């Protein structure tokens, strides 16, 4: 880089301009070298010479809104005010012998369009600035320009707006045809000064004519040969001068008019409209980029106070900051609910996304920030009732309808003061909001699939099985400790076999009736053999004073059922003798009944009474065990495995009972031997008893 710069400095230019350029380059290189001793890239050196030309207005957010016109979307693309179009029009007029009025101002405007851009800074040729629209709405402005339908409107304040077209040709036509040049004293002065120029020019012509005459006279004196020719030439010159003097005032008039109008257009002066609107004086001019809405214009708008603010549901009057803030929070909450409850078709991609529809047809531009509408609050926050006192309501129905325009700009002005122009759109807007915020519940039921239904059924079955398997021992047994071993065994069989139901059997009678009918034989399974003490206690039963009797569910009912089914008259059945001894034991009761009265008259002896007292608790225990044993046999049918386990215990009890019976028989025989009258009968009884014992 240093070598290149040195080469640039050493180049010698021939012209002075080249020298100045080389000197400027060498000076800039020297400054760069002095400031930066190290090598510097070209881009960094050029940054120092870049000027920053940005205003603060450009940094502010664009708060302009567009209110579109449906009728302004068509463009012909033909410039009617162009020079070619005007010449074609004149040719047609001559062909049909029609004298067209030439409008030089249109030609001047068309030809001077580039000059307008140079003379007017930041001009927008496609837009016109319209002032004096104090009581006009958006539709009124569109109706005023119905011959030249605009594309959209940009409201600036209550009294002015920008009317925008899609091309600059239509805007210039509207400006020239709908407005006229402003009345000024300069126009009259120019008109009065131009006739005074005419006699001056005629005098000059006459003077020249007189001088010519003098010269001709001198020439005639010298030679009088060409008198006629000279006279003809003089006449022709005079005629030419007169014709020129007659044409000059017309040209000056035309140029003066065009020049005045040209000056007014170049100065961008407001031009009054040809026809007023409802008595309002309207003015038109070209719009510029500086014609923008100021911040806080909505808060200062008197139109909103008079006709209602569409940004806040069409409320009239002065709206407090707290009321505006609450309105914004409600609107935000409503939008959040709307996004949380989308339609089912939106998630599936069947329906297009929802767009706001209203008569103003706003373009989706960034909204004006809420901070512009709010000022610093005073101490404390006002109540809603206090804020409502300040607000003047149009009517109660408009309050319930909700906001007319959610994305409204400074003002939508839909139809002006007449509220009937946008009622249909507002009703459609509210209905669409309700449809979005509250989706139908019937559609949500259709989203369930067959796999979900199968899964729910499987879960219900699994839960029922878990409840059955997690049941306690009492639910499987079906009775308490005093309910008997038969109820316990049956309860286990039922709990292990039945899987379809989870009902708990609490009554032994139901089990016994099922066993009678034989319904449980198919579902029953062999009982599981348990260890020692628990099996003996379950089969032999518990004492009546056992503390576990309280826990039993229906012990009394089971005893009553056993007593009803089988009378407890037989002692041997209560003692629980083995089955092969039952026949011999049951065959003796009728003979015992015959001698029952004799034994009651004689009374027991001391030994017999002592043995009887000792046998009472054992007989009670054996009787209770016999009762439970009978229940076990009636309820469970055949239990071969249980009898094999208890055969040793039964043999021991049987041996003890036989010894006691033999002792009692011996005592009876010794007592009966002392009675001679009854010796034969006693001997028979004794023989029978010995045979039975053997």
From Swiss-Prot:
* Compositional bias annotation for Acidic residues: 37-47, 212-235, 368-386, 634-646
Q: Name one Pfam family in it.
A: NCBP3
Cellular component (GO) terms are: cytoplasm; nucleus
User: Would the keyword rRNA processing turn up in this protein's UniProt record?
Assistant: no
Q: Which UniProt keywords apply?
A: Cytoplasm, mRNA capping, mRNA processing, mRNA transport, Nucleus, RNA-binding, Transport
Regions of compositional bias (Basic and acidic residues) in chain numbering = 15-36, 236-264, 387-404, 501-517, 563-595, 605-618
Domain of life of the source: Eukaryota
Ranges where the record places region Disordered? 1-47, 183-277, 336-430, 461-694
Q: Where in the cell is it found?
A: Nucleus; Cytoplasm
Question: Where is this chain compositionally biased, Polar residues type?
Answer: 189-203
Q: Where is this motif: WLDD motif?
A: 155-158
Key word Nucleus present in the record?
yes
Q: Which GO terms describe its biological process?
A: 7-methylguanosine mRNA capping; mRNA transport
Instruction: Explain the purpose of this protein.
Output: Associates with NCBP1/CBP80 to form an alternative cap-binding complex (CBC) which plays a key role in mRNA export. NCBP3 serves as adapter protein linking the capped RNAs (m7GpppG-capped RNA) to NCBP1/CBP80. Unlike the conventional CBC with NCBP2 which binds both small nuclear RNA (snRNA) and messenger (mRNA) and is involved in their export from the nucleus, the alternative CBC with NCBP3 does not bind snRNA and associates only with mRNA thereby playing a role in only mRNA export.
Q: What is the name of this protein?
A: Nuclear cap-binding protein subunit 3
- Give the taxonomic lineage as stored in the record: Eukaryota, Metazoa, Chordata, Craniata, Vertebrata
